């Protein structure tokens, strides 16, 4: 069992140890490292759906990441931008996504899945 809690410490060259996302078949929530430097722990029990579409920002900016993955929870929507996001979607489908975070653009060439940006928007307040 790995005790490494820092996703940056993972090897960028291995598809199994991608610093953008991690998997664990025994998790009950996903740890979202957002670009606002906050970390959000969102429970799979509140997962509503995930949707992957082409990133609409590419129409105006050719350098924008080509894919957009929206992960919708009961009280929050996580937006992930990047390339090869189908691997992240497969982890969500199996409730195995442990964490997701953006990594520097310099890793793009060495990764099949690269997360360029992560944002969390709360859709309603919970009490």
Where are these regions (language model features)?
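Phosphoinositide-dependent membrane-docking surfaces
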Residues: 42-58
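Short, surface-exposed polybasic-and-hydrophobic patches located at secondary-structure transitions
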Residues: 57-87
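Helix-rich interaction surfaces within compact, conserved domain-sized segments
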Residues: 77-127
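Generic beta-strand hydrophobic packing signal
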Residues: 30, 50, 118-120
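Anionic N-terminal interaction surfaces
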Residues: 1-25
């Amino acid at each position: 069992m790995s005790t490494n809690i820092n996703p940056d410490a993972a090897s960028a060259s291995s598809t199994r140890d991608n610093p953008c996302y991690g998997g664990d078949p025994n998790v009950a929530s996903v740890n979202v490292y957002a670009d606002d430097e906050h970390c959000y722990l969102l429970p799979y029990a509140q997962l509503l759906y995930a949707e992957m579409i082409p990133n609409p920002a590419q129409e105006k900016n050719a350098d924008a990441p080509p894919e957009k993955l929206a992960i919708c929870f009961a009280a929050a929507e996580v937006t992930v931008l990047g390339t090869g996001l189908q691997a992240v979607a497969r982890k969500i489908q199996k409730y195995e996504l442990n964490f997701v975070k953006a990594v520097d653009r310099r890793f793009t060439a060495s990764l099949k899945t690269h997360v360029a940006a992560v944002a969390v928007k709360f859709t309603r307040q919970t009490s």
